[in-house]
């Protein structure tokens, strides 16, 4: 049975009214057992709300277009609900596992994790329990049959109603051991888990690198580290670091770095060598390289920071160090408009992209923080109309927002030269 708009509006209004009444209460008259009982009521309500969200998220994903949303579903949820993009992504993925679905012919289908969804809908399990069960299911070997998977999921959902998430995680690990005692995982299983994440920069500019690597990548890293991370190799503290051949005994003796620090410096040296080799070819019309934007004032003062095309804030000391072996460009702007780009070569499309790195930094869509490396160049005035490529009529757009500019959305330059 389909609910009417009036029923939905009335139900949510009643929910808001009831919550408003609860917020106005004082609880001084209650005993400790009574307060604990009310906390259980609060927890039950908190656990049930995601079930409502799952249905809404899935329906939006199934029935809406990117043009209507103004971007991909996850980005829209993040902006509309004022949550992080990672949280929005988690909710979309959880809704896919626990929300009601529909077949291509339109008939309703049960959630993928039926028992877990039912327990959540009744407020018996919370986000922590759901996270444990979903992680368990997604880590099961591909050869486990559907019947076994469903039984394991039912058992975990039942146990989740009686135990804390940390206790449930131990039980899930035991079930995993029972189902796969020999640790028999296929290449497909390992490929599903592979991935590296470069975390956000801390206040000191440092970033955390985390993830899972395949046995093949691990073997490759071991071989590289055996050479480049040996004591005395690739040591940035030395005036003339050894990057080829073998380090001298004196270089090795004076190397005070820890093993993790040597691993870090080896990775940096190896990637820098790959970039300078030219073997990576081009990316978005430019040779694969580090592009840093800074000001002449900061360079002259040897203070401040630069901004890379990937969105990294680079201390000016690092900018100067990189600039020793780089091609330099000088971009000049006047009230937001590009006046000139001076270089030994004629102004061309690669140079225009560099100008956009310097001006826009990344995607110019409102609220979007995708950095320039991952953006495409967009003509604010459609090329079919202007028939020219003027840097002051260009901007950067990410893969999610750029296509929308020609599908119901428009862009323009304001008086300050910024894209709207």
Curated annotation (Swiss-Prot):
InterPro entries: DUF222, HNH_nuc. It comes from Mycobacterium tuberculosis (strain CDC 1551 / Oshkosh). SMART domains: HNHc. It comes from the Bacteria. The lineage of its organism: Bacteria, Bacillati, Actinomycetota, Actinomycetes, Mycobacteriales. This is Uncharacterized protein MT1160. Belongs to the Rv1128c/1148c/1588c/1702c/1945/3466 family.
């Amino acid at each position: 049975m389909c609910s009417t708009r009036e029923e939905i509006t009335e139900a949510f209004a009643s929910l808001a009214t009831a919550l408003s009444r609860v917020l106005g209460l004082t609880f001084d008259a209650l005993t400790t057992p009574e307060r604990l009982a009310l906390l259980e009521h609060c927890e039950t309500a908190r656990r049930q709300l995601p079930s409502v969200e799952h249905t809404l998220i899935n329906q939006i994903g199934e029935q809406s277009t990117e043009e209507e949303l103004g971007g991909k579903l996850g980005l829209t949820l993040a902006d509309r609900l004022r949550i992080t993009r990672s949280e929005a992504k988690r909710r979309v993925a959880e809704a896919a596992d626990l929300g009601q679905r529909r077949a291509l012919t339109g008939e309703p289908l049960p959630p993928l994790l039926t028992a877990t969804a039912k327990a959540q809908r009744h407020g018996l399990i919370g986000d922590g329990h759901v996270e444990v069960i979903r992680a368990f299911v997604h880590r099961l070997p591909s050869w486990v049959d559907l019947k076994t998977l469903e039984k394991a999921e039912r058992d975990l959902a039942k146990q989740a109603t009686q135990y804390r998430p940390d206790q449930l995680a131990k039980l899930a690990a035991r079930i995993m051991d029972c189902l796969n005692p020999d640790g028999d995982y296929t290449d497909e299983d390992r490929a599903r888990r592979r991935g590296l994440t470069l975390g956000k920069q801390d206040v000191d500019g440092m970033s955390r690198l985390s993830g899972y690597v395949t046995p093949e990548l691990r073997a490759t890293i071991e071989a590289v580290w055996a050479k480049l991370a040996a004591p005395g190799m690739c040591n940035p503290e030395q005036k003339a670091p050894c990057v080829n051949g073998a380090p001298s005994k004196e270089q090795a003796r004076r190397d005070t770095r820890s093993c993790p620090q040597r691993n870090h410096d080896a990775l940096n040296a190896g990637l820098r060598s790959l970039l300078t080799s030219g073997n990576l070819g081009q990316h978005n019309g430019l040779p694969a390289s580090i592009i840093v934007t800074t000001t002449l004032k900061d360079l002259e003062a040897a203070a401040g920071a630069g901004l890379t095309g990937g969105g990294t804030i680079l201390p000016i000391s690092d900018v100067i160090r990189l600039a020793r072996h780089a091609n330099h460009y000088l971009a000049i702007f006047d009230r937001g408009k590009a006046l000139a780009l001076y270089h030994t070569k004629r102004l061309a499309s690669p140079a225009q992209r560099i100008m956009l790195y310097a001006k826009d930094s990344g995607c110019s869509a409102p609220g979007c923080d995708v950095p320039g490396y991952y953006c495409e160049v967009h003509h604010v005035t459609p090329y079919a109309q202007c028939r020219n490529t003027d840097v002051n009529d260009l901007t950067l757009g990410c893969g999610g927002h750029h296509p929308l500019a020609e599908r119901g959305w428009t862009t323009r330059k304001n008086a300050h030269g910024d894209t709207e």
